[in-house]
Curated annotation (Swiss-Prot):
SUPFAM superfamilies: NAC domain. Residues 1-21, 255-337, 370-400 are annotated as: Disordered. It comes from the Eukaryota. It is found in: Nucleus. It holds the Pfam family NAM. InterPro entries: NAC-dom, NAC_dom_sf. PANTHER family: NAC DOMAIN-CONTAINING PROTEIN 86-LIKE (PTHR31744:SF210), PROTEIN CUP-SHAPED COTYLEDON 2-RELATED (PTHR31744). Interacts with JMJ14 and NAC050. PROSITE patterns: NAC. This is NAC domain containing protein 52. Residues 318-337 have a biased composition (Low complexity). One of its GO terms (cellular component) is nucleus. Induction: Induced by type III effector proteins (TTEs) secreted by the pathogenic bacteria P.syringae pv. tomato DC3000 during basal defense.
């Protein structure tokens, strides 16, 4: 982990005007400029070609093919001991009207290795990535070194879409040094040195100056009433991401109890016996409700279980009205009072039975509907439907083709080995045939001489 800093000047130190110094801001330990291939092409290189600003200007500009790779560190905006640097570079065409590029330096040349790799976002082609290795000396006798460069360039689609025809004006180069042959490893990162960070003044964390204001700014005109209304409205909103609250069923039960209490208050003045009967009925209904499994309550629609309660309240209100009508002439005579009391008790009992039957009918309504509407058997098709195979994605097709290519290469090698073994066997048999033929000729000569 090296000490990294960001130079503010846009030109290399050699091109800096006299009398001006480059102001560097150190990055905090652990922070490195390590973007992905897609970010390098679609953000940094694209904005450089189009002349748009970037949020964190960490890539310097240099003619990379006019300098040796070990001399490029001084032109980097990230002053670090890590063996990895990023640069913008203008391409130098070898011929004016050709497509070949001149990648030769004073003491060597950059040689492309392998095929150019595509940089895609899903199926959209963003750019191309070329891998080059630095060779010291002159071709074709150059000596391979451990300096590697990844050259990123835009494709014509990106530039035509933005109305720019100079896609080859700049390329983005990532230069790094490997200690051994093979894929790059973590040895490009310099070790951490604690003495370099004795004072953390001026340490920068990229993006730390971005402040997100999650709360709205206060209103200066002093409309307190409007603010209170907005807050109350925001509290009354229901968040669909929150789990169902357990207080919703309790509110309904408390509402039901309050409603029953309000319905029973007039009957306290009319008849004490009727009040006792209704109180027992209410307790019995509450016990039945507690014994039943709790019904699911929807948070978005709290009025889901209310139709049953409204039905019960309507039946009880009708019974209360009947009882009040029956007890209007309570003071007329003793016989009338006794008859009205009997009628009130019977009506309240009938109302209770009606409410209980309504509960049973409501709970069994779904079962009866299912019994009344049996499922019709499906008619068999005359012809079986062909199985629908899912469409394979382009990535799966590419993987299948790669597997087939690998399998074909393995089979080809196997055939080569079998052919070589067959040729060896044929040569052995041919030598045996020649030996037998020669022996046969010698035997013929001996027989002829003996005769």
């Amino acid at each position: 982990m090296g000490r990294e800093s960001v130079a503010v000047v846009t030109a290399p130190p050699s091109a800096t005007a006299p009398g001006t110094a480059s102001v560097a801001t150190s990055l905090a330990p652990g922070f490195r400029f390590h973007p992905t291939d897609e970010e390098l092409v679609s953000y940094y290189l694209k904005r450089k070609v189009l002349g748009q600003p970037v949020r964190f200007d960490a890539i310097g500009e240099v003619d990379i093919y006019k300098h040796e790779p070990w001399d490029l560190a001084v032109f980097s905006r990230l002053k670090t001991r890590d063996q990895e640097w990023y640069f913008y570079s203008a391409l130098d065409k070898k011929y004016g009207n050709g497509a070949r590029m001149n990648r030769a330096t004073n003491r060597g040349y950059w040689k492309a290795t392998g095929k150019d790799r595509e940089i895609r976002r899903d199926i959209l082609l963003l750019g191309m990535k070329k891998t080059l290795v630095f060779h010291s000396g002159r071709a074709p006798d150059g000596l391979r070194t451990n300096w590697v460069m990844h050259e990123y360039r835009l494709v014509e689609y990106e530039t035509e879409k933005n109305g720019n025809l100079v896609q080859d004006a700049y390329v983005l180069c990532r230069v790094f040094h490997k200690n051994n042959i093979g894929p790059p490893s973590g040895n490009r990162y310099a070790p951490f040195m604690e003495e370099e960070w004795a004072d953390d003044e001026g340490a920068l964390i990229p993006g730390i100056d971005v402040k997100l204001r999650l709360e709205p700014p206060p209103v200066a005109n002093g409309n307190d009433q409007m603010d209170q209304e907005i807050q109350s409205a925001s509290k009354s909103l229901i968040n669909i991401n929150e789990p169902p609250r357990e207080t919703a069923p309790l509110d309904i039960e408390s509402d039901q109890q309050n409603h029953h209490e309000n319905d029973l208050k007039p009957e306290e003045h009319n008849n004490n016996n009727n009040y006792d009967e209704n109180e027992e009925t209410l307790k019995r209904e509450q016990m039945e409700e507690e014994e039943r499994p709790p019904r699911p309550v929807c948070v978005l629609n709290k009025e889901a279980p209310l139709p049953l309660l409204q039905y019960k309240r309507r039946r009880q209100s009708e019974s209360n009205n009947n009882s009040s009508r029956n007890t209007q002439d309570h003071c007329s005579s003793t016989t009338t009072t006794v008859d009205n009391t009997t009628t009130l008790i019977s009506s309240s009992a009938a109302a209770t039975n009606t409410a209980i039957s309504a509960l049973l009918e409501f709970s069994l309504m779904g079962i009866s509907d299912k019994k009344e509407k049996p499922q019709q058997p499906l008619r068999p098709h005359k012809e079986p439907l062909p199985p629908q195979t899912p469409l394979a994605s382009p990535e799966e097709k590419v993987n299948d083709l790669q597997k087939e290519i690998h399998q074909m290469s393995v089979e080809r090698e196997t055939f080569k080995l079998e052919m070589m073994s067959a040729e060896a066997m044929i040569s052995i048999l041919q030598s045996r045939i020649d030996a037998l033929r020669q022996e046969n000729e010698e035997l013929k000569k001996n027989n002829a001489n003996g005769q």
